[in-house]
Amino acid sequence: MNYLTEYDDLVNVCRLVNNYLDPNGIFLFDLKTDHYFKSIGCQSFCDADEEVSFIWDNDYDEEKRINSYALTLFVQEEDNRYERFDEYHEQRAFSIDEVRCAIEESGMIFLSAIDKNGAPATKDTDRVYIIAREKGKTPLQNL
C-alpha cells in the first residue's frame, strides 16, 4: 500500500477491497511508517556476492512523506556475464489517522493498527499492520 502516493488512491483501493469482501470479512495489510523511512533517510546501500550485486540510492522527503529510491542490480547470467537492471520506486508513509479515515471513507470499520508483535503501533514502529472489517452488507439471496 506504500506504493500508493496519493490519499485518494488509498481510499479507492480500500473501496475496491470492500466491494469484494464477504459480509464482516477482514482486510489485513501492512505499511512501512514515517519512522522507518526517516531511519533510512537519504542514504546509499550496496551489497555484492558472486551472483547478485546492488546499489540502492535512497531519498526521503519528510515534508511530503515520499520515499524515492533508485535501485541498480547486477545479476550473473549462466555464461558468467552480469546483466544490469535499473528500477525506480516511490512510496508514501501514510499516518495511521490517514489510513483510518481512508478505511472509514471506503465503508469499512477500522479495527486496529499493530506492530509485528501484536502490540498497538507507536511512533517508533517501523512497519504497522492494519486490520479493518467490512461493515456487514447483506449477502445476495439465492435466486
Predicted segments with their positions:
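A short SAM/SAH-binding and catalytic strip from SAM-dependent methyltransferases
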Residues: 1-9
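SAM-dependent methyltransferase
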Residues: 7, 28-98
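A short glycine-rich, Lys/Arg-flanked "PGG" loop and its adjoining helix->strand segment in the class I
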Residues: 10-26
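Solvent-exposed loop and beta-edge segments used for protein-protein assembly and interaction
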Residues: 23, 63-65, 124
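C-terminal lobe and adjacent flexible extensions of AdoMet/dcAdoMet transferase-like proteins
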Residues: 90-143
